[in-house]
Amino acid sequence: MTVCNIEDCEQSKLEFLNGRRFDVLVNFMTMTFSEKILDMLLAKNTLLVNFPIEDSLMFHLDSRGTLKECMKLLHDHGHTRVGYVSTIDSMRWVNDPRGIAYLDHLRTYGFENRSEYVVFNDDYAKDSSLVGYENGLKLFRAHPEITAVFVSNDIAALGVMRALKELGLRCPEDVSVIGYDGIQIGRLFTPSLTTVGYDNVEYGKEMAKRVIERILHKAPTAEREFIFPAKLILGESVGPCLRK
């Protein structure tokens, strides 16, 4: 087993993958791979998981209902000016479940629909915490009126919370923050992070089970897509809107 973070660079991906033999390659990122790389992996009989091709096994987190629940939570707390800090670029974001849920439910819950309330990341070499920190500074310097913010992942959300502190904004008294992933470290911060998570142990077990079945049978199975439910994990980073 090899766990790695490949640079989002065509040559780096080619060099890393071409020099190794993988029975299975699981893509846990939103990273894209060229047709050349995918053809190379398929030629080596590598089983691909979470790649946007016909022969790949796909494991999805069903977070649509949970993301809507997050929007309702903010609405019930009186928030109407809700921003978004993305760790991906604008082209990917509009096709990402998190971005889709945000856009779909803005009007449903009476939030202000302003494109300038969303900031994106175009530098995939940066760590998520730095992306959250820098884009948090950028967003709240430009729009201090925002009272709640969604962040693409928990690590970036912690970066946003650091940015808020430097700007003299309190969480959640001045700004409520919601992350995504449900990582353990978010529960250890003060305030603890409200986030969208899932049972990652069961998720991993089910993925391993399906992958092993596919390898042992050495034949495609009828079922290629597997869905896992997400859940809202309430922390201390969301509170009533105190700034009207």
Regions found by a protein language model. Give the residues of each.
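Bacterial carbohydrate/catabolite-sensing allosteric modules
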Residues: 2-24, 33-244
